[in-house]
Design a protein with these regions (language model features):
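A charge-rich, low-complexity, intrinsically flexible signal that marks solvent-exposed coils, linkers
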Residues: 1-34, 43-69
Length: 69
């Protein structure tokens, strides 16, 4: 999955596949995780958030199925 760099203290890169509703996040500390069944509007809100890290922690982490890849 293609990812883009983001300005965040915790998240380094973010990718999204709308066909499978999968968000992929690479963290600065090295882990890569995928979050499943995430609607495209949530990805859009994440990318437009004033603080990507805060939005991710409040709205995505723990709210969608995830797996380390």
């Amino acid at each position: 999955m293609e990812r883009v760099s983001v300005a965040s203290g915790n998240l380094a890169e973010i990718g999204y596949d709308p066909a499978t509703e999968t968000l992929e996040v690479m963290f600065h500390q090295g882990g890569v995780y995928q979050y499943y069944n995430l609607p495209s509007f949530m990805h859009e809100r994440l990318m437009q958030a004033e603080s990507i890290g805060k939005y991710f922690n409040a709205e995505i982490k723990g709210h969608y199925p995830e797996a380390r890849v």
